Amino acid sequence: MSFIRSALAAAAFVALSIGAVQTASAADPENTVILKLKDGDVALEIRPDLAPKHVAQIKKLVREGAYNGVAFHRVIPGFMAQTGDVKFGNMDKGFDAARVGTGGSNYPDLPAEFSKEPFVRGTVGMARSQNPNSANSQFFIMFDDGPFLNGQYTVVGKVVSGMDAVDKIKKGSEAENGAVKNPDKIIKATIEADTK
């Protein structure tokens, strides 16, 4: 009898776990970005409650197809993977290895929207220059916790599924600040609501 009870409990746990993953990625399809990577899909929950201007710009760029083909040009093991240079980072058209990481979109830079949301594994933050109001299209995904970024960079969301694919993104050279030769790319980015 205890074997049956244990088996039922295990089955219930698995069912609840699967349901939780599905719910997490579909909680708000309008604010879920799906990144198709070489090792699988990554679902990002983007948070207009934390950074409304940044989220609006990301969604606009996703819907325009601007992130499709864009390289993960700076990837530092144990820290983060950076992408989103839609001007110089497109691996399918106009990739500029010398300038990747310096570009943005044709839209204006955004004012900082710092929050108390911490930078932990899976957090998605906006990349910027030393000017806190210079974020535009580039973003990064944390491999590990980064408390030194808290309150210094805008958090736009988090990975809700597919972190295993993020972990497999080709890493760069630490000696070259994470610059990646022959980098991996975002094959395609979509808003989940647009795929239904």
Swiss-Prot record:
Domain PPIase cyclophilin-type per the UniProt entry, residue ranges: 29-194
Gene3D superfamilies the record matches: Cyclophilin-like (2.40.100.10)
GO BP term (any one): protein folding
Gene name of the encoded protein: ppi
Pfam families: Pro_isomerase
GO cellular component, one term: periplasmic space
Keyword Metal-binding: no
Protein's name in the database: Probable peptidyl-prolyl cis-trans isomerase
Enzyme Commission number, as recorded: 5.2.1.8
Assigned keywords, A-Z: Isomerase, Periplasm, Rotamase, Signal
Broad EC category: isomerase
Family of this protein: Belongs to the cyclophilin-type PPIase family.
Subcellular location as annotated: Periplasm
Keyword Calcium set for record: no
Broad class of where this protein is predominantly found: periplasm
Domain of life, source organism: Bacteria
